[in-house]
Amino acid sequence: NDTLRKAELGDTSLVPQAEKVLDQLNRTIDTPRKMWEPAMVGAYYAVPDVIAGRPMSMRQQITTQDEVSPITVLVVTTSSAGIAAETLAKRGTVILALVMALSRVRPVTLQALCCVDGYKDGTGETIITSEINTHPLDLATACYVLTSAGFARRLTYGLATELNHFRGGWPKGFTYSAGGGSYYDKLIPRLVTDPKRCLLIEAARLNDALLVNPTEWLNNQITKFTTNEEEMV
């Protein structure tokens, strides 16, 4: 069917909309990384420097701010039935713009997440991850997965039903009215090896900030992400 075809081949019809949003975003995105520098005291000796009698013959690790640190972007595509397909499409174009911006300056890993209930395995939870090629960024697939209600509600919900008896609810431990913050905090370490450099975009809501003011949301996410890393490192 059309959903399966586009899931395989992608769909670029909304890429121009994402590019319009991207045109309004003009900032450099920095994240810290670890590097070694010469020092009088440090973790180990640089043998050539010792032989040469250089005073800065040891190496110490420092944190620098640059544009090479990899970022993992997790996008929850699950949504309440009250969220219209048009709203999901608009939301997806803004998220695509963010991914496009990040991928221009550093390695990015992009995954779409289906987070629903499930009763076959007794956990009350089904997580389906869909990793999208970002080296280089597969615009067609990213655009379709991020903007399509069909991908989320037909394909991933169908898989969840088949694999783990999805019954139409949110996963165990998730409270929609509370925003799901604590659930996501516990989910991130289960999915990525470096939670400090992970940006999770939560399930769609009618009052999403990214829908009200896309440019402001993009800038806020980038600022928040960078600030969090500076505090955690």
Regions found by a protein language model. Give the residues of each.
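Acidic, low-complexity intrinsically disordered regions
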Residues: N1-T72, T77-V233
